[in-house]
């Protein structure tokens, strides 16, 4: 029997994190987690073309690894975590398996976040939080950051 879940919500009380995996497939008690990344042809070529100029994003790997950790907590095991890159310009698809060791890195990351938050809202770290400048437009704290930037903070 195969079960497929799209936008599967996971909540971890131990890590104090909530996330939505794009797809979770359970087949014969094996659990697979997928996160889908949509990119344009140029970004796809830079990542997968003959002369690869850009390595995969550690942030994307840690995102899907976090979903893997959460799935393992819910289902008791995890058999694979994957990033699916979809080229929106020509519909080409590339599936990459993420090393399950990244799950340990994700656990360490979320535990460090819990420690930081014990002392109040942590400061922003360029390249970490936010990982990319464009992420700011999706953040609940954007207006506060904009005010802080104007003050020189």
Language-model segments: residues:
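Residue-level detector of alpha-helix boundaries and kinks
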Residues: 8-9, 52, 124
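A short acidic/basic microdomain associated with nuclease active sites
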Residues: 1-14
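Conserved catalytic cores of phosphodiester-cleaving nucleases, focusing on short active-site segments
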Residues: 17-53, 67
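A generic secondary-structure signal marking the coil-to-beta-strand transition
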Residues: 2, 30, 135-137
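Short, charged, amphipathic alpha-helix that recurs within catalytic cores of restriction-modification
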Residues: 52-71
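Generic hydrophobic, aliphatic-rich segments that mediate packing or membrane embedding
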Residues: 2, 17-19, 63
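Metal-dependent nuclease catalytic regions and adjoining charged, substrate-binding loops involved
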Residues: 13, 57, 70-153
